[in-house]
Amino acid sequence: MEIKGINHLLFSVSHLDTSIDFYQKVFGAKLLVKGRTTAYFDMNGIWLALNEEPDIPRNDIKLSYTHIAFTIEDHEFEEMSAKLKRLHVNILPGRERDERDRKSIYFTDPDGHKFEFHTGTLQDRLRYYKQEKTHMHFYDETAF
C-alpha cells in the first residue's frame, strides 16, 4: 500500500460565509457546494472543505508555526503581497530568510489558520541547507 497524494484539506471555521469569501478572494477557490455548515471548493485541483464549528476555541493556535505553504512564481510575489494587503488579510511577520531560500509571505485566514505563499522549491531549500547548515545530515543526495 502506498499513499497516492493528499486527498483534501479541511478547516474548521467559526463563520462559514466569512471564510467562503476569504478563500474565494485570496486563493481564487471555486465554490462547488455549500450546505448549512459545510462548503467544498476546487482550488486549482485541490479539494478544500470548510466545516463551520463556531464554538471551538481558536486562541492558542496562533502560537504554532504549523502552516500550509502554496507555491507561487517569483514574478508573482509582489502582486500577491499587494493583493493580500488590498484585501486586508492578516499578514504575519516573516522570519529572516536567505535569498537562496527564496521569498515567502505568511498570513492567516479569519480563524487563524496559517498559510504561506512561497517562491522556492524543496530542492532550493535542500541546496541552501547543504551549503549553510553543516550540522544537518542529508539522507538522499539525489533529492537535490
From Swiss-Prot:
Taxonomic lineage from the root: Bacteria, Bacillati, Bacillota, Bacilli, Bacillales
Cofactor(s) needed: Mg(2+)
One GO cellular component term noted in the UniProt record for this chain: cytoplasm
Binding, Mg(2+): 8, 67, 116
EC numbers, comma separated: 2.5.1.-
NCBIfam families: fosM_gen, PRK04101.1
Name the record gives this protein: Metallothiol transferase FosB
Broad EC category: transferase
Regions annotated as coiled coil: none
GO biological process, one term: response to antibiotic
Subunit structure: Homodimer.
Inducing or repressing factors: Expression is sigma W-dependent.
Pfam entry (one): Glyoxalase
Domain VOC: 5-120
Family, as annotated: Belongs to the fosfomycin resistance protein family. FosB subfamily.
Organism: Bacillus subtilis (strain 168)
Subcellular locations according to the entry: Cytoplasm
MF (Gene Ontology): magnesium ion binding; transferase activity, transferring alkyl or aryl (other than methyl) groups
Described function: Metallothiol transferase which confers resistance to fosfomycin by catalyzing the addition of a thiol cofactor to fosfomycin. L-cysteine is probably the physiological thiol donor.
